[in-house]
Curated annotation (Swiss-Prot):
Keyword Secreted: yes
Signal peptide: none
Keywords: Amidation, Amphibian defense peptide, Antimicrobial, Secreted
Main location: secreted
Tissues showing expression: Expressed by the skin glands.
Annotated GO CC locations: extracellular region
UniProt name for this protein: Peptide PGLa-BM3
């Protein structure tokens, strides 16, 4: 559902931010 999709997108963004921070 939308919640699952939103969670996936947020997860990807979080990973991108974490990688960028490193």
């Amino acid at each position: 559902g939308m919640a699952s999709t939103a969670g996936s997108v947020l997860g990807k963004l979080a990973k991108a931010v974490a990688i960028g921070a490193l």
